[in-house]
C-alpha cells in the first residue's frame, strides 16, 4: 500500500460510511479497477477509529447526555426521554451482534461478491426511494419504543450483507416507521457508535493475534482522512436531507449499481 492508496481508501470510507450509498460498493472499485491489494487488518482498524471519532465528536453533546441518562437510569431509576433513547440504542444494537456472530462466515464466503454488491445497491436504493415517498414522516427519535428499536436493529443486522449500506438500511427502516428524515438520520448515526466500536474492537483483537505488521504512517493517514471526511459528510448530509430528501442518493445508488454490473459484464 502507498500513501496515495491509504488516502483514497480512507477518503472513500469516510465519505460513504454515513451516507445511504454503501461503503462496500465503493471500496471494491479501487481493487477492481486498479488492482490494489487488500488494505489489511491494521488499516481497517484505523478507518473504523477515524469514522467513530467523527460521529462521537459531531454528536458529543448528545452522546454525553445519553451516557449520563443511561447510568442514571441504572443507578437512580431515571426515566427521562434521554434515558429511554439510550436504552433503545442499546436494544437496536443487539440484532446486529447476534446476526454477526451467527452469519459472519456465511457472509464472507457466499455474499462478499461484486455481483451481490451491485444487486443490493440497486434493490435497497429502490426500497429507500419508495419508503421516502410514501411514509408519514412525523416522529422524532425520542418516540422510539422497543418494537421500533428492534425493527431498526434488524435492518442494521441485514446491512451486514455487502452493498446494503448500514446507514441506508437503518434510515429506510426509521422512515418506514414514521420518523422524519432528520430524526431517522440522527438515530442511525447514534446507533452507529456502539456497532462501529464493537466492529473496530473485534478487528483490533484480530490484529493483535495475527501478528500483522503495522505501518504507523498509513494508520495515521487512515485515521485522519476518514475522520475529516466523515465529519464533513455527517454535517452536510443532515443539512441536505431536510431540503432534498433521499432522491439524490437513490439516483446515485442506481447509477452505481448499473455501473458495477456494466463493469463486471464487460470484464
UniProtKB/Swiss-Prot annotation:
Record's protein name: Undecaprenyl-diphosphatase
Principal subcellular localisation of the protein: membrane
One BP term from GO: peptidoglycan biosynthetic process
Phylogenetic lineage: Bacteria, Pseudomonadati, Pseudomonadota, Gammaproteobacteria, Vibrionales
Keyword Transport appears in the UniProt entry: no
Localization: Cell inner membrane
InterPro entries hit by this protein: UppP (IPR003824)
GO CC, one annotated term: plasma membrane
Segments passing through the bilayer: 1-21, 39-59, 83-103, 111-131, 144-164, 189-209, 218-238, 245-265
Its EC number(s): 3.6.1.27
Membrane topology: Multi-pass membrane protein
Stated family: Belongs to the UppP family.
Keywords from the named record: Antibiotic resistance, Cell inner membrane, Cell membrane, Cell shape, Cell wall biogenesis/degradation, Hydrolase, Membrane, Peptidoglycan synthesis, Transmembrane, Transmembrane helix
Pfam families to which the protein is assigned, alphabetical: BacA
Catalysed reactions, semicolon-separated: di-trans,octa-cis-undecaprenyl diphosphate + H2O = di-trans,octa-cis-undecaprenyl phosphate + phosphate + H(+)
Gene name of the record: uppP
Principal EC category: hydrolase
Additional note from the record: Bacitracin is thought to be involved in the inhibition of peptidoglycan synthesis by sequestering undecaprenyl diphosphate, thereby reducing the pool of lipid carrier available.
GO MF terms held by the record: undecaprenyl-diphosphatase activity
Source domain of life: Bacteria
Keyword Membrane attributed: yes
Protein function: Catalyzes the dephosphorylation of undecaprenyl diphosphate (UPP). Confers resistance to bacitracin.
